[in-house]
């Protein structure tokens, strides 16, 4: 374990990283009521009722097995809207696999990580209950030292299709379940390690001087040795932390931008562990309704991107994610909104290194309340947002987003979610993020002045930008001239819907965007057609819509509304976007 290995190797190459992806034993149940007792026991015999399933993979994508049904719905909940309850006939899957632990590793702290499981899960190891977690698109981590032994160990999970958290995950997408991101064990030092860290930078004297601060959360009584290396390989500073803090002052910092994504290497050494942090230095501010990056006015030329693959569902291979970003670069896209949930953690590493502006979105949408219950439109839409019993669930989603992604320079806006009305719980999310860093920019579209008028009270305190969806060009002009905007820049989090032969009006929008500094740009809805590919009987695949699997409710062909086909072949509209951007 040394600095050289840390600088050159991926996580998969570390001996302290144990990947558990691969074939797992799996059994599907149409209802949790039918789940047999004792499946989690250490000596449970896996019988012929179990199949093999690939992890990561949504169980609905095992089309030949008939586990459940792929279901595409936009805003309608796929079950009766009665929070916090979900149907008793709740489909679920049992996952079982054995894994080995080396005896030497028992002297380290062992952390089992799940980067994405939809919608919730219960976890056992060697017959003992370890814990429970939900929030589908966020990492869940468990210390498993009290549950494992040297040699073979049995891991068992019960994953439910729906839970109370599903009321906050009503995104426009194919509804799919199971383990859809990586599973692995981290083997951490007990004698001394970095539990967490937060790197911030402050620029002074017209960007000629920089103060880099690192707040460390340490395990053990050791301080941290550090070394800072410039993007060009020059050693800037080295030393040791004091009381868990590092402060580095240096001249002529090299700034990060989407066009010139230069990153410093910060090496943190606790003797038993070495951590490499890729640090970007930027100055992002809003001044007099204008968005500035490093003192220059910037425009967001963005797209909304879902995790979607025609063969793998939400279990999008990381190579496929990288290819998406290359496609963006080839089409002059400089910004990505992670609609409508956090992406794979490595996505932001790629955005840091390739140069993208990221609107990083919480895993939160409650769109179905706008249509599924009685009452005034905005009041019912904001039902959970104004319910104190849901406050901690909202804050939890903001906290887990921010703490996971806080060290990524590519993030320009922290988004509180999508289409969930607006209420006190959104304000609590905003307040939490600002308590961690008062200088970051927080985004939420349902806090714009149109919704304040509908709600009969001002909602704009939980968003630093005036964000709208699909306003006409004339409406944009009205917004830009309105005092109701409260000196916030106008940003279109969704515009120019790309369904069919769209988007056809990009040029007209960008004439206005380019003519007004208060208009900072927008993100086209959306990047890719969502579809499940099925064999056509002739050795090829055909793409499906909502309802093609008998799924109800469904939103039909509204899932194919992207700039590219499911296989990423560009539509003609993407060529127009490339030209305009």
Question: What feature does the model see in each segment?
Answer:
Residues 124-130, 229-231, 271-272, 294:
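Short strand-turn-strand beta-turns centered on an Asx-Gly dipeptide
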Residues 1-10, 53-55, 62-65, 73, ...:
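Extended substrate-binding grooves/exosites of carbohydrate-active enzymes
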Residues 180-198, 282-297:
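Low-complexity, Pro/Ser/Thr- and charge-rich linker/hinge segments at domain boundaries
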Residues 10, 25-31, 50, 61-66, ...:
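Accessory beta-strand-rich segments of carbohydrate-active enzymes
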Residues 146-152, 215-287:
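Extended acidic/polar, glycine-enriched regions
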Residues 190-220, 570-581:
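Surface beta-strand/loop "capping" patches
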């Amino acid at each position: 374990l040394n600095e050289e290995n840390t600088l050159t190797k991926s996580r998969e190459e570390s001996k302290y990283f144990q990947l558990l992806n691969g074939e797992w034993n799996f059994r599907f149940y149409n209802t949790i009521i039918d789940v047999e007792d004792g499946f989690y026991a250490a000596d449970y015999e896996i019988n012929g009722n179990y199949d093999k399933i690939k992890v990561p993979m949504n169980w609905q994508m095992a089309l030949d097995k008939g586990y459940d049904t792929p279901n595409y719905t936009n805003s309608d909940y796929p079950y009766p809207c009665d929070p916090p309850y979900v149907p008793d006939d709740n489909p679920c899957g049992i996952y079982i696999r054995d894994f080995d632990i080396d005896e030497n590793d028992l002297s380290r702290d062992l952390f089992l990580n799940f980067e994405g499981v939809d919608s919730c899960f219960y976890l056992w190891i060697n017959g003992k209950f370890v814990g429970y977690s939900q929030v589908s698109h966020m990492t869940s981590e468990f210390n498993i030292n009290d549950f494992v032994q040297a040699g073979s160990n049995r891991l068992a999970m019960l994953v439910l299709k729906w839970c109370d958290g599903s009321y906050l995950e009503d995104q426009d997408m194919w509804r799919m379940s199971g383990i859809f991101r990586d599973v692995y064990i981290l083997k951490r030092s007990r004698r001394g390690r970095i539990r967490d860290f937060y790197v911030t930078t402050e620029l002074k004297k017209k960007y000629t001087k920089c103060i880099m601060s690192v707040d460390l959360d340490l395990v053990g009584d050791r301080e941290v040795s550090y070394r800072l290396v410039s993007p060009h390989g020059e050693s800037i500073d080295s030393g040791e932390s004091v009381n868990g803090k590092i402060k580095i002052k240096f001249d002529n910092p090299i700034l990060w931008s989407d066009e010139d994504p230069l990153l410093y290497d910060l090496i943190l050494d606790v003797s038993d562990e070495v951590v490499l942090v890729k640090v970007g230095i930027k100055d992002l501010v809003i001044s007099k309704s204008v968005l500035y990056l490093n003192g220059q006015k910037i425009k967001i030329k963005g797209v909304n991107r879902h995790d979607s693959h025609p063969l793998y569902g939400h279990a999008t291979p990381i190579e496929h994610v990288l290819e998406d970003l290359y496609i963006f670069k080839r089409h002059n896209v400089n910004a990505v909104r992670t609609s409508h949930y956090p992406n794979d953690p490595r996505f932001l590493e790629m955005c840091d290194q390739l140069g993208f502006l990221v609107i990083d979105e919480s895993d939160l949408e409650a769109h179905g309340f706008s249509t599924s219950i009685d009452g005034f439109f905005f009041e019912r839409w904001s039902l959970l947002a104004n319910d104190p019993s849901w406050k901690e669930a909202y804050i939890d989603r903001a906290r887990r987003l921010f703490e996971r992604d806080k060290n990524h320079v590519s993030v320009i806006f922290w988004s509180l979610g999508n289409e969930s009305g607006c209420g006190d719980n959104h304000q609590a999310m905003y307040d939490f993020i600002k308590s961690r860093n008062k200088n970051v920019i927080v985004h939420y579209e349902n806090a714009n002045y149109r919704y304040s008028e509908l709600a009969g009270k001002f909602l704009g305190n939980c968003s630093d930008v005036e964000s709208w969806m699909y306003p006409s060009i004339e409406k944009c002009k009205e917004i830009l001239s309105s005092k109701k905007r409260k000196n916030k820049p106008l940003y279109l989090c969704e515009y120019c819907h790309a369904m069919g032969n769209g988007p056809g009006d990009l040029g007209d929008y960008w004439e206005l965007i380019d003519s007004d500094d208060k208009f900072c740009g927008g993100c086209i809805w959306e990047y890719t057609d969502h579809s499940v590919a099925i064999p056509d009987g002739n050795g090829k695949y055909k793409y499906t819509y909502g309802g093609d699997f008998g799924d109800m409710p469904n939103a039909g062909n509204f899932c194919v509304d992207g700039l590219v086909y499911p296989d990423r072949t560009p539509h003609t509209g993407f060529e127009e976007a490339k030209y305009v951007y």
